[in-house]
Amino acid sequence: RMGASRLEYTICTAAGRAASLSMTGLVNEANIEDIPKMDVVILWATNLVTTGIHAMPFIEEARANGAKIIAIDPRVTRTTAFADWHVQPRPGTDAALALGMLKVIVDRGLHDEAFLREQTIGWEKLIDERLDDYPLDKVEAITGVPAADIEKLALLYGSTKKSFIRLNWGIQRHDNGGAMTRAIRCLPLFTGAMLTGGGLCVGTGNEMRGIDPVKLQRTDLLAGRTPRIINMIQIGRALEDKTLAPPVEALFVWNSDPANCVPDTASARRGMARDDLFTV
């Protein structure tokens, strides 16, 4: 009603959400409260010790129950230090790592063919047309992870249905973020991990927000108008652009930290420091 610009968001989840919807639709993800029942827990591209402490009691309980905790991350973090094993692929190569694991799982007959036939489509095409492209030596060359470690990881994960993957947002910010998400999501589908309460989850906390985006955005008030769209990752450019007409004169920030989390933080900070910008 005020004529405000709309924000194209989010910097976190767009690629992964699109990838997930293309594979599994709007289905419930695995629940972190089931982690204590797992034999293998993979913390993939996430730093839960620092940024997801609400999940850590469940992971610590799983370890106390004998679970193996694996962290997959190019970085060294507090979570990789906490894990029993740190696997370090090169940034952006997670899809190759996941497909290499899948090839080992299939070659060793660890996949749940009955589950795949009953609950999925396209799995035979993936095996016939793609997995042979990812032998261990090639995956090692792509990811930098030794072939023996890839095989060990695949066998550890594939040897039980009681497995849980906690995937995070970081990989989705690569140009192949959707492909990486899809490849990783194939792992619990091939092992049938969902049958034990395991599987994969990305968000651990969204269910607590209870936000209805339709009520929040109130598109019914547009009355046929098409508002200007500003991409969240370009907020700094929008705030600094002196040719933008009309200029952005007010900024409402909710549940976000653009001064620290957008790609060009220097530009965002300069824009937010404008004397003529009203920021809430």
Q: Which residues does each PLM region occupy?
A:
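Cofactor-pocket helix-loop regions in the catalytic cores of large enzyme subunits
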Residues: R1-T196, C201-G205, L216, L221-V280
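Beta1-alpha1 glycine-rich phosphate/pyrophosphate-binding loop at the start
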Residues: D212
